[in-house]
Amino acid sequence: MAQRCVCVLALVAMLLLVFPTVSRSMGPRSGEHQRASRIPSQFSKEERVAMKEALKGAIQIPTVTFSSEKSNTTALAEFGKYIHKVFPTVVSTSFIQHEVVEEYSHLFTIQGSDPSLQPYLLMAHFDVVPAPEEGWEVPPFSGLERDGIIYGRGTLDDKNSVMALLQALELLLIRKYIPRRSFFISLGHDEESSGTGAQRISALLQSRGVQLAFIVDEGGFILDDFIPNFKKPIALIAVSEKGSMNLMLQVNMTSGHSSAPPKETSIGILAAAVSRLEQTPMPIIFGSGTVVTVLQQLANEFPFPVNIILSNPWLFEPLISRFMERNPLTNAIIRTTTALTIFKAGVKFNVIPPVAQATVNFRIHPGQTVQEVLELTKNIVADNRVQFHVLSAFDPLPVSPSDDKALGYQLLRQTVQSVFPEVNITAPVTSIGNTDSRFFTNLTTGIYRFYPIYIQPEDFKRIHGVNEKISVQAYETQVKFIFELIQNADTDQEPVSHLHKL
C-alpha cells in the first residue's frame, strides 16, 4: 500500500513542473454579426505539412534570453518578421489589430461580432533559455525532424504554444471564421527573465479599460501512464502559482593571508548558514487546496485501502505528508522549497576572502508570504554576521475558481473532453513554476495554465534541459485544441463574478 500511495502522490507532483507599433483596422461589418456555424478541426495534408514546417522554422530562430539585461535582440526582432511571413491571414484580416509592445512582444486584438460578450486572453512566450550544444542529439536550434519528432529549444517551452495559437487562428480565418467573443493573443519576449513585455501588455489593456473573462497560459499537462496499474490519463489545469524569492546571503570580514587564518572565515560562516537552511526545511502546509482536490478525484480510481486514504486527507494528512516529502516533486507542493543556486567567494588560494555571497531561491507555498519566509529564514540562520538582501520576490498567486460557474475552467474542461475523449479526469492544481500570467491579476480572477499535450516523466527533464522535443502528432493536436477552444469560447455564457482566493 505504501508503495502504491507514493506512486499516486508522485503523479500529483509531476503536474506542477508542473505593445506600441499599431496597425489599426475595422471590426467585422454589421452584416457579419451572425453566429458562425461550427467548423470541424480537420486539416488537409498540405496544411499539416505547413504547420509543422512553420514550427520548425520558429525553432531555428535563437530567441535566447540570458538575463533581464541580456538577450538576443536580433533574433527577437527576426521572430516578429517571421510570424508575419507564415501567418499572412492573421496579420491582414480587417478585424484583427496587431501591436508591437516593448519593442519585441506582440499583442493581437481579435474583434468579435458580439460586443456584449466579455473578451478573453490567450498567452504564450517565444523567448527561450540558453541551449549549449553539449549533450544534444541534434543542434538545439536546428528544428530537425526525425521519425515524426521535432527537436529543438522551445518545442515544449514555449514556441509550440506561440505557433499553435497563431496557426489555429490562421486556419480558422482561412475557413472564413468570425468570432462572436472578442479575444486577445499576447506573445511575450522575455518570460524567461523579467517579463517586462507581459507587464507592458497588461498595463496597456488596463489603460484601455479591458476586463477579461479569463486567461489561458502555459502550465499543466495531460499525464498518462505515470502510475503502475493506473492507466487513465488525467488533465491537470493549474489555477494558481507558487510565489518566489531570490535571497542573497552575505558575510563580510577583514581579508588576510591564509598562513594566519582566523578561527572562522567568511566562507565558513556562510557555508554553515546555508547548510542550516538545507537541513531545516520550511514547515509542511497541507491545507485544503488543490492537492486535496486532486487526491480526492483520484481516490475513486483505486481499491481499498488507498481509496480511503486519498478521499480523507483531513484524517490521513500526517501519513500522506510523510510520503510526499520523500520525493522532491511531491515535497514541492506541500511546502515552500529552499534551493541554494549560487555561491561566490574567494579570489586566490592563499587569500582569506573578505566577502562571501550565496543566493537562495525559495518557491513559496500559497499558505505563506514572502515576508513570512524571510523571517523564518533569518530565524533558521540565527547568525547576525549574515546579511540578507532580497533580490526579487513576489507572493503566491491567487487561486482562480474551478467550479461549475468558472467559464474559463469549464471551457478548458469541455475542450479537453472533445479533443481528448479518452481523458475523463480533469483536476485543478497549483503550479510550482511561474508564468507571465502573474502580471494579469488586475484584469481577471480567472487565470488558467494548461498545455494540451501528453507528457511523460522523462519529458520534464527536457524542458530547460537537453534534447527538448515534441512529436508532430502532439503539435497537430495542440493546434486542434486551440482551434476548438476559440470556437467553444463563443458561448453565450458569461463568467460569474468571483473573489480571488488566497
From Swiss-Prot:
Cofactor binding summary note: Binds 2 Zn(2+) ions per subunit.
Glycosylation sites: N252
Cellular component GO terms, alphabetical: extracellular exosome; extracellular region
Keywords: Glycoprotein, Hydrolase, Lipid metabolism, Lyase, Metal-binding, Protease, Secreted, Signal, Zinc
InterPro entries from the UniProt entry: Bact_exopeptidase_dim_dom, Pept_M20A, Peptidase_M20, Peptidase_M20_dimer
GO molecular function, one term: peptidase activity
Cofactors required: Zn(2+)
Subcellular location: Secreted
Signal sequence annotation: 1-25
Functional pathway: Amino-acid metabolism; Energy metabolism; Lipid metabolism; fatty acid metabolism
This enzyme's EC code(s): 3.5.1.114, 3.5.1.14
Keyword Lipid metabolism: yes
Catalytic activity: an N-acyl-L-amino acid + H2O = an L-alpha-amino acid + a carboxylate; an N-acyl-aromatic L-alpha-amino acid + H2O = an aromatic L-alpha-amino acid + a carboxylate; L-phenylalanine + (9Z)-octadecenoate = N-(9Z-octadecenoyl)-L-phenylalanine + H2O; N-(9Z-octadecenoyl)-L-leucine + H2O = L-leucine + (9Z)-octadecenoate
Additional notes on this entry: Genetically increasing or decreasing the expression of PM20D1 reduces and aggravates Alzheimer's disease (AD) related pathologies, respectively. These findings suggest that in a particular genetic background, PM20D1 contributes to neuroprotection against AD.
Function summary: Secreted enzyme that regulates the endogenous N-fatty acyl amino acid (NAAs) tissue and circulating levels by functioning as a bidirectional NAA synthase/hydrolase. It condenses free fatty acids and free amino acids to generate NAAs and bidirectionally catalyzes the reverse hydrolysis reaction. Some of these NAAs stimulate oxidative metabolism via mitochondrial uncoupling, increasing energy expenditure in a UPC1-independent manner. Thereby, this secreted protein may indirectly regulate whole body energy expenditure.
Sequence similarity: Belongs to the peptidase M20A family.
Full protein name: N-fatty-acyl-amino acid synthase/hydrolase PM20D1
Taxonomic lineage: Eukaryota, Metazoa, Chordata, Craniata, Vertebrata
